[in-house]
Swiss-Prot record:
The lineage of its organism: Eukaryota, Fungi, Dikarya, Ascomycota, Saccharomycotina. Glycans are attached at residues 51, 68, 97, 187, 244, 373, 393, 406, 437, 505, 570, 704, 772, 801, 895, 912. It catalyses: Hydrolysis of terminal (1->4)-linked alpha-D-glucose residues successively from non-reducing ends of the chains with release of beta-D-glucose. This is Glucoamylase 1. Residues 517-532 have a biased composition (Low complexity). The gene is GAM1. Keywords: Carbohydrate metabolism, Cell wall, Cell wall biogenesis/degradation, Glycoprotein, Glycosidase, Hydrolase, Membrane, Polysaccharide degradation, Secreted, Signal. It comes from Candida albicans (strain SC5314 / ATCC MYA-2876). The N-terminus is blocked. It is a peripheral membrane protein. It comes from the Eukaryota. Its main location: secreted.
């Protein structure tokens, strides 16, 4: 294999060296074989949405009629009888069972499944939680429901209406239901000019405008615009400004899906399973988010340290390189909470290992001990596949994770019962089967043994869509070649830079361009147009052709094959379930297993997991990062709607690779991005092997911008932690879209270049190169906004697009009046910060009122025994802090700043004692309050009058 060249970058007197890490230090790389490229090429598919000759199911299907309707205590049941079989994409089911259930005043379930469930996959509750009935069946009265179910019998169709207004929220009437073994389709009407959000995960703006086609199939691919990527969230939110209401529709299915958003309709398709629809009535956006997320699983409460700054890259290939990065952060006084490793630390890229030469255990542990002694943390990457050792190589064959797993029968199989062997980073690999009886026990042991050698603080799960670099069980009969190299060049060797680089770095750009031209060759890579044949491409009994189903979705891989960069749909689990039916939840069930394994290591310590693939309910176990983005401005912009979409999906702890993962960044982009990313819940810088270094100390400008933003972030840690807790108990996201905050203003529906953090902070980033200003809207009639840095009240017109000064190194940040923000003096780590004095930032609204909350606990316990809750209320020139809970905070209150005070007060009282104050530009500053709060800032209730 050709090694990538070294990249030398001089940064502030330092020389950083980034190497392409060898696959293993213990084997000669030149002797290593490669997975044959032809094994990575799938059978070319033509997606139906691009096939002009494809049959339109709506035009052909005859639908069903409804018979034998019976009322129940909670709704009704009935039988759907097929009017005429058309067998468009599979065979039609003749009889279906219909069940309608009013589950609560705000939730309705419509469930349709074949009467004969032979060979039909019904998603078990053990894999994906089912919303529960609320109330006593004997006393429940569905006439009190916010929702009403109505139906037509002869040509079956149904409507869900809002009971208070009779507004139709969902209607299939006039469109035939299609329900076959490999194709389910229904259509609903939408109002013209609709505002549809959700249906993640994809790189797209916040709104799903007419013409959007969402492919819901978990996919290992580097963040394409509009294509299917890592996660699947089958829920949409319909915000209607004519009635000022919002509702949500959730299809509880793990099937392969496709959603087509039209001008006045939405078509939803699935390639297996049953219809299990849940309607949430809202009526406000936050209401409906809370209703949905509460049912799929409230988000995990993250440890306090998770809110610190995280640094990573693919290319930290020795213990010494990690040590150097940590030392450089300290040298330049840039706060660093957590250092991460990509696959470099592994021995031959194998899970549960560390390279004996580059990451020897004794040296590695010494580094981690030093890190922990400084209250810092370490998180390694962990891939989904387990290496199959070469039985002809005694050294290679000594790999317990495979042998124990194989003996315990915990790996996925081919339909014939043999091991399904794909290919990932270490070579030919097998894949844990989380439906097998012994997998959790095996998983617990592997993680515990690994932790005893390498005491990590969290886990970063990757490649868990689940991904494979070849099509089908390509390692069957080939694992004797292990270790083998992936069928592509590893890392990045290009010379592309972000938009605007040629102008802002003209001399450097000239030399790069000349060097690229000098080394450019006319060599081209041939590409095969032939299709490969999957030897296991057989018809699954009773299910049809599941590797190549009759309806082809637009899977965003070059050949659209479902098995490209994935394991084949016919890979089989211990209970007979095939991947075709549950591919989309592999990440969810793997991350849940890791969560349980980490609890085995530390029974009452919050597991910290950042995962790539996700599904409805994943937020209960993990946070999420946005995957392999690109170092360019358009990707920086898309990080905002991606974050907002994840919030809607119940995963509020989200961030992206700041400065970009793929390609080379530059000083300007990295400065802007490091400041924007500092307001995301998860804050990490990460990039690809072979690209230039992009740690914030590489450029002085980036370093200064980063220090400024980390200082702001760390001062706001109590506020962020309070928002984490709010999200944990209610499901309300931390980052908030304009249309959630101001649901009655349709002109704000598509705003996703700005966002709120909680209710209090408005972030307006610069998202383009070469400018020293940005534009932003400040919504809300009579709303008051203050500049976060100067504390000055701003003179903005509600809804107007304002121009804001934003020189490089500055990101506009405003406080919305009516909020009280708890703060704390920032330290180098979150642990240091927690030892420092508190402050309060009070931003009065136009009526002179404000409110806020503070939540604190020990920052790590799963079962919190002692917590502190503080409610802040300001009104009529008086602030009152009401304290609840037993958690003891010894740090004093040092300062309080009150914004929006029209005239200087004659005196200020703290618990009726006069305190000194300063007054400037409408702000009252109180300092030296420690003497009043020696027992702790929130040891008791206090008041401030002015």
């Amino acid at each position: 294999m050709k090694l990538l060249s070294k990249v030398f970058v001089t940064a502030l007197g330092l020389t950083s060296i980034v190497n392409a890490a060898p696959t293993s230090s213990s084997s000669a790389e030149e002797a290593q074989k490669t997975v044959p490229v032809e094994l990575s090429i799938g059978v070319k598919q033509l997606p139906n949405i691009h096939n002009d000759s494809a049959v339109d199911a709506n035009a052909v299907a005859k639908g069903y009629s409804l018979v034998n309707v019976s009322l129940t205590a909670r709704g009704l049941t009935g039988i759907l009888k097929l009017k005429e079989a058309t067998n468009i994409y599979g065979y039609d089911f003749e009889y279906l069972n219909l069940s309608v259930e009013y589950q609560s005043d705000t939730r309705l379930n419509v469930h349709i499944e074949p009467t004969d469930l032979t060979d039909v996959f019904v998603l078990p509750e053990e894999l994906v939680v089912k919303p529960k009935l609320e109330g006593d069946a004997k006393t429940f009265n569905f006439e009190n429901s916010d929702l009403v179910f109505e139906y037509d019998e002869e040509d079956f169709g149904f409507e869900v209406l809002r009971s208070s207004t009779r507004e139709v929220l969902f209607s299939t009437k006039g469109n035939p239901l299609v329900f076959s073994n490999q194709f389910i389709q229904f259509n609903t009407t939408l109002p013209k000019g609709h505002s549809i959000t959700g249906l993640g995960e994809s790189i797209h703006g916040s709104l799903n405008e007419p013409g959007v086609v969402k492919t819901l199939y978990a996919n290992d691919i580097a963040d394409p615009i509009d294509g299917n990527i890592y996660g699947v969230h089958p829920v949409y939110y319909d915000q209607r400004y004519n009635t000022n209401t919002t509702h949500a529709v959730y299809w509880r299915t793990s099937a392969i899906q496709e959603v087509v958003v039209g001008e006045t309709s939405l078509t939803w398709r699935a390639l297996s399973g049953v219809i299990d629809l849940y309607f949430f009535s809202g009526p406000d956006p936050k209401d409906v988010i809370q209703q949905y997320v509460s049912e799929i699983g409230l988000p995990a409460m993250q440890p306090y340290w998770a809110l610190g700054y995280h640094q990573c890259r693919w290319g930290y290939d020795t213990v010494e390189s990690l040590e150097t990065v940590v030392e450089n952060f300290k040298k330049f006084d840039i706060p660093l909470e957590t250092i991460w490793s990509d696959i470099d630390y592994m021995d031959g890229y194998k899970d549960f290992t560390n390279d004996p030469y580059r990451f020897p255990t004794d040296k590695f542990r010494k580094f981690l001990d030093d890190l922990h002694n400084n209250s810092q943390h370490y998180v390694p990457i962990f891939d989904a596949a387990i290496y199959v050792p070469n039985p002809n190589n005694a050294t290679d064959n000594d790999y317990e994770p495979f042998h124990l797993g194989n003996e315990s029968d915990v790996f996925l199989k081919n339909p014939d019962g043999s091991l399904y062997i794909g290919a990932v980073w270490p070579g030919y690999t097998v894949f844990p089967d989380f439906l097998a009886n012994n997998t959790q026990e095996y998983w617990n042991k592997m993680f515990k043994d690994w932790y005893e050698r390498i005491p990590f603080d969290g886990i970063w799960t990757d490649m868990n869509e689940v991904s494979s670099f070849c099509v089908g069980s390509c390692g069957t009969g080939r694992y004797f070649d292990n270790p083998v190299h992936p069928p592509f060049e590893v890392g990045y060797s290009g010379s592309d830079y972000p938009l605007g680089f040629d102008k802002s770095n003209a001399s450097e750009w000239k030399s790069i361009s000349e060097a690229a031209a000098a080394t450019k060759t006319t060599t081209t890579t041939s590409s095969s147009t032939s299709t490969s044949i999957d030897g296991k491409n057989t018809l699954a009994p009773g299910k049809g052709n599941i590797n190549y189903p009759p309806y082809a979705i637009n899977n965003n891989q070059g050949d659209h094959d479902l098995a490209t960069h994935a394991i084949s749909p016919n890979a089989t689990h211990a209970d007979g379930t095939v991947e075709y039916d549950i591919h989309n939840i592999y990440g969810l069930i793997q991350e849940r297993a890791i969560y349980e394994a980490l609890l085995e290591i530390h029974p009452n310590k919050r597991p910290f997991i950042i995962g790539r693939s996700s599904f409805a309910g994943s937020g209960k176990y993990m946070g999420h990062w946005g995957g392999d983005n690109y170092a360019d401005y358009y990707m920086m912009y898309f990080s905002i709607p991606q974050a907002l979409s994840m919030g809607l999906s119940g995963i509020p702890f989200f961030g992206v690779d700041a400065c970009g993962f793929n390609g080379n960044t530059d000083m300007e982009l990295c400065s802007r991005w490091m400041q924007l990313a500092s307001f995301f819940p998860f804050y990490r810088n990460h990039n690809v092997l072979g690209a230039i270094p992009q740690e914030p100390y590489v450029w002085e400008g980036v370093m200064n911008a980063t220090k400024t933003s980390i200082n702001v972030r760390y001062s706001l840690l109590p506020y962020y932690y309070t928002l984490l807790h709010e999200s944990h108990v209610t499901g309300i996201p931390i980052m908030r879209a304009f249309n959630w905050q101001f649901p009655y203003s349709k002109e704000l529906a598509g705003v996703d270049t700005q966002f709120f953090v909680g209710d209090a902070l408005l972030v307006t980033p610069v998202l383009e190169p070469g400018v020293n200003h940005t534009k932003g809207v400040f919504p809300g009639e009579n709303a008051v906004y203050y500049d976060f840095y100067t504390h000055k009240k701003q003179k903005f017109t509600a809804g107007k697009n304002e121009t804001l000064a934003a020189p490089l190194g500055h990101i506009p940040l405003h406080i919305k009046g009516g909020n009280i923000i708890p703060t704390q003096e920032p330290g180098y780590t979150t642990t240091e910060s927690r030892k420092n004095p508190f402050g309060l930032l009070v931003a009065l609204d136009a009526e002179g009122t404000a409110s806020g909350k503070l939540y604190l606990d020990d920052g790590e316990s799963v079962d919190v025994e002692e917590a502190l809750y503080v409610d802040f209320v300001a009104s009529k020139n008086k602030l009152v802090a009401s304290v609840f809970g037993e958690y003891e905070v010894r740090q004093p209150l040092a300062n309080v700043t009150i914004l929006g005070v029209d005239s200087e007060p004659k005196k200020v009282l703290f618990n009726n004692e006069t305190v000194s104050h300063n007054y400037e530009n409408g702000a009252v500053y109180l300092t030296d309050l420690e003497k009043f709060t020696k027992e702790g800032a929130f040891a008791e209730e206090f008041s401030i009058q002015w």
